[in-house]
Curated annotation (Swiss-Prot):
Role summary: Part of the twin-arginine translocation (Tat) system that transports large folded proteins containing a characteristic twin-arginine motif in their signal peptide across membranes. Together with TatC, TatB is part of a receptor directly interacting with Tat signal peptides. TatB may form an oligomeric binding site that transiently accommodates folded Tat precursor proteins before their translocation.
Gene from which the chain derives: tatB
Protein name in UniProt: Sec-independent protein translocase protein TatB
Keywords: Cell inner membrane, Cell membrane, Membrane, Protein transport, Translocation, Transmembrane, Transmembrane helix, Transport
GO BP terms in the entry: protein transport by the Tat complex
Subcellular location: Cell inner membrane
UniProt similarity note: Belongs to the TatB family.
Single GO cellular component term: TAT protein transport complex
Biased composition (Polar residues): 108-117, 147-162
């Protein structure tokens, strides 16, 4: 780490033993060890932070949205120009280019696309389960003829007199 050899460490320990004394040497060695551990953890966390910021920077560079937007617009312009050339060359109607140039979407107001499907009409009266189709048609004929009422005796002249 500090490029210190084994002999140099022994020389430093002998000098520290003479200066500090044998009684306080274990306590100082513990404090130096704690300081070295904190220093290593700090250096490792700084390396991780620099790697994280470098990764974030790489992601931002790869996601350069403005450049991608410009590329997409240039492709769109190229396609529009090519389509115009083909349109002029083959004499295609102007209605085909309408989706590119239209400001408002066209509405399909009178077509089948706007009409909702109609629901089938269900009979409102309940029929008895014993009736057969033949008897039910005869009954409907009877009811339809009996529903027709006779003309009333009142005339428009008599209603005006009252």
């Amino acid at each position: 780490m500090f490029d210190i050899g084994f002999l140099e460490i022994i020389v430093i320990m002998v000098i520290a033993l003479i200066v500090i004394g044998p009684e306080r040497m274990p306590e100082v060695a513990r404090k130096i060890g704690q300081f070295m551990g904190k220093t290593k953890r700090f250096i490792n966390s700084m390396k991780e932070n620099s790697e994280i910021t470098e990764t974030v920077r790489d992601l931002q560079n790869s996601m350069n949205l403005e450049e991608e937007k410009r590329n997409l617009e240039s492709v769109s312009d190229t396609l529009h120009d090519d389509f115009s050339k083909i349109q002029d060359e083959f004499g295609i109607d102007q209605e085909i280019s309408r989706p590119f140039d239209a400001d408002e979407p066209t509405a399909f107001s009178g077509t089948q696309f706007n009409k909702a499907p109609t629901q089938p009409k269900m009979p409102t009266t309940e029929e008895s389960p014993s009736s057969t189709p033949e008897t039910s048609t005869k009954e409907t004929e009877k009811t339809s003829t009996s529903d027709v009422s006779a003309p009333s005796e009142s005339t428009p002249e008599s209603s005006n007199k009252s």
